[in-house]
Amino acid sequence: SPVFADRYVFVGYPGGKLVALAIQNGAPVWEGAVALPKGATELDRVADVVAPPAIDGRLICAVAFQGRVACFDMGQGGALIWARDISSASGLALDGRYLFVTDDKGVVYGLDRLSGSSLWKQDKLLNRRISAPAVRRGNVAVADAQGIVHFLSREDGSFVARQKTDGTPVRTSVQPLGSGFLVQTSGGNVSLIEPQ
């Protein structure tokens, strides 16, 4: 999905590209490499930006499947600030201090948003088809294929709480709303959940 900020529309493309387009005429303004396709087969070379980029101030970050997470400076013509080899099929979230990303195996990372250095890693959700993270009031929320929303501490990635939904998979991204998180399951249930 495109993301709008300032005078630009930001779009992730197959091949691992993040492109800034001018809102007034759609002309490309700059392009950044989130991932560089590599591998022997065409399937190995899939490195698509699969989730909307996240923006905080001048910082824009994106993640690619079979690629990496990368952050760019919008004020410097899309100059690469940092990149880390983390593949994700779900996405990422930013707040004032951290970048949170779920990798394609179900590991959730807390990274320094300005340097990309690891602050914490939560690997106890492996192979649960974890959603993109969402952050609100010190909690990072991710949902899984069993319909469970897991709340992690923003500071160290430890588990804070868990909430069950209707038991069907959460197929959409968790969305911060008010003091909680909006969750939609494949069973059609929409819930506003707060960590308890």
Question: Can you describe what each PLM-predicted range is?
Answer:
Residues 22-26, 73-77, 112-115, 153-157, ...:
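Short loop/turn segments that connect beta-strands within beta-propeller blades
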Residues 98-113, 117-151:
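Loop/turn-rich, solvent-exposed surfaces of beta-rich toroidal or solenoidal domains
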Residues 1-6, 28-55, 79-95, 119-137, ...:
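Extracytoplasmic beta-rich repeat domains
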Residues 63, 68-69, 76-108:
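N-terminal leader/targeting helix
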Residues 6, 13-14, 64-65, 103-104, ...:
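Structural signature of WD-repeat beta-propellers
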Residues 19, 70, 109-110, 150, ...:
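WD40 beta-propeller blade core
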Residues 144-188, 195-196:
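C-terminal closing repeat unit and adjoining cap/tail of repeat-based domains
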